[in-house]
Structure formats: C-alpha cells, structure tokens
Amino acid sequence: MQLNADNEHVVIMTPKGGIHSGIPFVPVDMPSVYYDVVTQEIIIDGNGYSAYYDVDIISESTLLTVLSTNVDGDYDTIDVSSLPDDNYTIVITSSNNNEYTGQFTNY
C-alpha cells in the first residue's frame, strides 16, 4: 500500500510517464487518483486537464461493476463507503478515449 505524505490518502494511480516511439511521455489526460482511508472516498484530480472521465469500479471477488459514474476531472470525490469490504479495480476512461486502471481495497 502506497501512502502519500499525510498517510491518509492511498495512491491508486499517478502520471508516471512511459515510452512511446522511444520518446518518454506522460499521457496528457491521466488523472491522479487517491483513496481516502478516513472518509472512504476516491479522489480524482485531473491535474488541470480539461478531460471528462467515465469511472467504473469493479469488485475483484464478483468481477461485477459495482459503481459507474462520470466526473468532470477538475477535482472530484466518489463515495465508496457503502461498498462491501473487498479489493476493487478502478477503470477510468477519459473523454480522449485513454484508459487507466488501478486497484484499491475498501475496508
């Protein structure tokens, strides 16, 4: 589990860059996504990009989508406190059709 400086936000995904045609790049619309341990919310920060995101949260025990929503990407929170304790995969698709995935545990 990777925590940020305040030890309450678990890092689900942050832009790390990659290699494309031999040139390092960071996807322009990749959000920073955190899980707030205290409030049990997913925090999605679009880092100033003007993308919109479709968010699907999939239970790893049932492989069913348990939550599906859209966010504008500026700075949004999604309440997952009502979801059962489980491991989840979060799939975020930007309005530019880029897809990002990460995992978190709700407890």
Where are these regions (language model features)?
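Short, glycine-anchored, charge-dense loop/turn motifs used at functional sites
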Residues: 59-64, 88
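Transition segment at domain starts
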Residues: 2-37
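Short proline/glycine-enriched turn/loop motifs at strand-loop junctions of beta-rich domains
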Residues: 47-52, 83-85
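Short, surface-exposed loop/turn motifs with a glycine/proline- and acidic-biased composition
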Residues: 72-94
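Aromatic/hydrophobic beta-strand junction motif of beta-rich domains
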Residues: 39-48
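Short hydrophobic alpha-helix segments
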Residues: 46, 67-70, 102
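Edge beta-strands of extracellular beta-sandwich domains
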Residues: 98-107
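Beta-strand signatures of extracellular beta-sandwich domains
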Residues: 54-58
